[in-house]
Amino acid sequence: MNAPETIQAKPRKRYDAGVMKYKEMGYWDGDYVPKDTDVLALFRITPQDGVDPVEAAAAVAGESSTATWTVVWTDRLTACDMYRAKAYRVDPVPNNPEQFFCYVAYDLSLFEEGSIANLTASIIGNVFSFKPIKAARLEDMRFPVAYVKTFAGPSTGIIVERERLDKFGRPLLGATTKPKLGLSGRNYGRVVYEGLKGGLDFMKDDENINSQPFMHWRDRFLFVMDAVNKASAATGEVKGSYLNVTAGTMEEMYRRAEFAKSLGSVIIMVDLIVGWTCIQSMSNWCRQNDMILHLHRAGHGTYTRQKNHGVSFRVIAKWLRLAGVDHMHTGTAVGKLEGDPLTVQGYYNVCRDAYTQTDLTRGLFFDQDWASLRKVMPVASGGIHAGQMHQLIHLFGDDVVLQFGGGTIGHPQGIQAGATANRVALEAMVLARNEGRDILNEGPEILRDAARWCAPLRAALDTWGDITFNYTPTDTSDFVPTASVA
């Protein structure tokens, strides 16, 4: 009697019907060397218990490019080897054994030129709810020059904005009108006038002031521009106020933007929550009409703040620069809103660099050539006051808008005095810096000396002193200890 024959399972072929691991379908290639023309993405992933990190990385690559849950024969009708995204590197996250950094390369032909909506539909459209992964976060991206050149970028940029304002050698100053809701058009305009007359360069609508029963948008625009014109005449300076044109439809947003232009406004504003197609459309309108576009990052914290899941703001900032905003809120580090100092400085690099170099301490994982795209003016706003002027200039330099909302309008001597306090503090600090003084360490002394001759600044320092919202940041680099803002 013959011995029973051992039956061995036949190895699976790539296009055999059924379910196959993503890494076996070609979405993992540890030997892959990214091309200069690839779009690169870095994800922080937390695989489910028992899931191989390499398989999880391959799943991210697959689900953000061409894969579905089972083998499909129609892949063979495409240049599938080229169109498959490739996870090519997986690193453990320092001090966090459950998390991994996975690097994914995408062929440039996967993306429509000049469309952030298309880019995001692939990169973040599906993978964040994939069951084998507990959590995923998009930490950084690199775009090839060929892709960057399909975007027009900011219509104005830092240099042209300064030329239009005729203001050089210092940060710009602004304030958000408070309270953000409830004022009548006339009272709103009065707040704007007082702030600009006192020395600010800009006033600003807040994210949720649109057209409500207490103040129709047209009334606000009329009273605000009357205030801007009167303050400009009184001071001899070019002034502006960010008029929020955010509305329920693109048609209505265009209508409000046209009205702002007809009144002589130099700048309009939109909220991040309007979406990428709308942001790019408004950027195109601003380019055609010689207007500055301010972007308030309303809603970003819902997906940027948590370290293990969502999208890092450095990625949002890169998308916004491509999309063509001229201003964007990027954090203060010393204010009331989330922001690790080094991480926030990384956001400023994304806005202002001609070529952003890898800097792991700032959370920048890739070099990025911006291909002569104009630079974005970062905006520091949220819980800052005159007593922090030395910290703000030390952290962010000159090319930034420092917006003191409560730090202007909450001044005990009134709005105009609050604006004057901020302007005097700024000019005293810039002068001291230009004289070679160590403003970070000598800053409090410099402010006290300036306050001897400026009652509004003295009152501001007496009211807020050295108040800083120094909480432990939730979003920090995993490569270095968190720096202190003190």
From Swiss-Prot:
The active site is at 178 (proton acceptor), 296 (proton acceptor). InterPro entries: RuBisCO (IPR033966), RuBisCo_large_chain_AS (IPR020878), RuBisCO_lsu_C (IPR000685), RuBisCO_lsu_C_sf (IPR036376), RuBisCO_lsu_fd_N (IPR017443), RuBisCO_lsu_N_sf (IPR036422), RuBisCO_lsuI (IPR020888). The modification N6-carboxylysine is found at residue 204. GO terms for molecular function: magnesium ion binding; monooxygenase activity; ribulose-bisphosphate carboxylase activity. Mg(2+) binds at residues 204, 206-207. A disulfide bond might be able to form between Cys-278 in the large chain dimeric partners within the hexadecamer. It is an enzyme of class 4 (lyase). Its EC number is 4.1.1.39. Pfam families: RuBisCO_large, RuBisCO_large_N. Disulfide bonds: none annotated. Binds 1 Mg(2+) ion per subunit. One of its GO terms (biological process) is reductive pentose-phosphate cycle. Keywords: Calvin cycle, Carbon dioxide fixation, Disulfide bond, Lyase, Magnesium, Metal-binding, Monooxygenase, Oxidoreductase. PROSITE patterns: RUBISCO_LARGE. Coiled coil: none annotated. Substrate binds at residues 126, 176, 180, 297, 329, 381. Belongs to the RuBisCO large chain family. Type I subfamily. Heterohexadecamer of 8 large chains and 8 small chains. A disulfide link might be formed within the large subunit homodimers. RuBisCO catalyzes two reactions: the carboxylation of D-ribulose 1,5-bisphosphate, the primary event in carbon dioxide fixation, as well as the oxidative fragmentation of the pentose substrate. Both reactions occur simultaneously and in competition at the same active site. The basic functional RuBisCO is composed of a large chain homodimer in a 'head-to-tail' conformation. In form I RuBisCO this homodimer is arranged in a barrel-like tetramer with the small subunits forming a tetrameric 'cap' on each end of the 'barrel'. This is Ribulose bisphosphate carboxylase large chain, chromosomal.
